[in-house]
């Protein structure tokens, strides 16, 4: 931020300063969530795809299971957790209809829990994207009001009498847009990525159950 922008912020009216502070905090929060969610979903997607690819290439389920059992259960990603849980549930059993149905219910519980974990704070991105423009608009309105108040206190129309209020209005609009624009883009991309991850994990679970039942 250059000196002029900082000076403008310091000279702005208190309501506009509060609005700008809220928008700046919202923008920082948005970017922190974007980076955190990007790395979380990328890690989960890559790990799940890796185990799905190994299964699809014909690697023995038992070998995949033993490799995953060496990891901490809390470190497993959706498809990895599904493989371990399905194997524990069905392997070395008679694979009756009741056991298969019980395993399918277990898979749904795991998927729902993982979806909830991976979607954490996504709603906050949606909230920022929808509210930031209106907060910025409020700052715009206050800035325009201040500009008109500047007119009312002078007998002659001059740029210096309206410039502070107009500047406040424009800055509030710009900061509101800067806070709002990245959030919906990231939210839509992350939601799509999460849906693909969950659907892929469910499809993997079905193939896994079928394969184990053949043994």
Task: Give the residues covered by each predicted segment.
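Physicochemical signature of membrane-embedded alpha-helices that form the seven-helix bundle of GPCRs
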Residues: 22, 125-128, 163
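Hydrophobic membrane-targeting segments
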Residues: 1-53
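Predominantly long cytosolic amphipathic alpha-helical stalk/bundle segments
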Residues: 46-158, 185-215
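Residue-level signal for the membrane-embedded core of alpha-helical transmembrane segments
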Residues: 19-29, 132-135, 139-142, 177
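Alpha-helical transmembrane segments of multi-pass membrane proteins
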Residues: 23-26, 184, 188
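Hydrophobic alpha-helical transmembrane segments of polytopic membrane proteins
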Residues: 169-185
